[in-house]
Amino acid sequence: MKTAENIAFGKRVAELRRNAGYSQEQFAFKCDVDRTYIGTIERGEKSPTLNTIEKIALALEMSKKELFDY
């Protein structure tokens, strides 16, 4: 479900992923999730689980706090 929070978080993930030089496919592999799941997060269509948030932060080599710093 698209919410303002999901959309903002998705934009943040997409921006950080691109800045790190990853395609969605590369990033999904690094996060150990499906590429389509990354796409739904970036479009604000899904709320990632805490486990996925942890994987995203680790893949981007940042803390969860930094991930939400937007």
Residue ranges and their predicted role:
Residues 11-27, 60:
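Short basic helix-loop element that most often maps to the first helix and adjoining turn
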Residues 68-70:
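Short amphipathic recognition helices of helix-turn-helix/homeodomain-type DNA-binding modules
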Residues 1-8:
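A detector for short, charged/polar N-terminal pre-domain segments
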Residues 13, 24, 35, 50-53:
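Helix-turn-helix DNA-binding elements, focusing on the entry/boundary residues of the two helices
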Residues 21-40:
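Short alpha-helical DNA-recognition segment
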Residues 51-66:
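DNA major-groove recognition helix of helix-turn-helix/homeodomain DNA-binding modules
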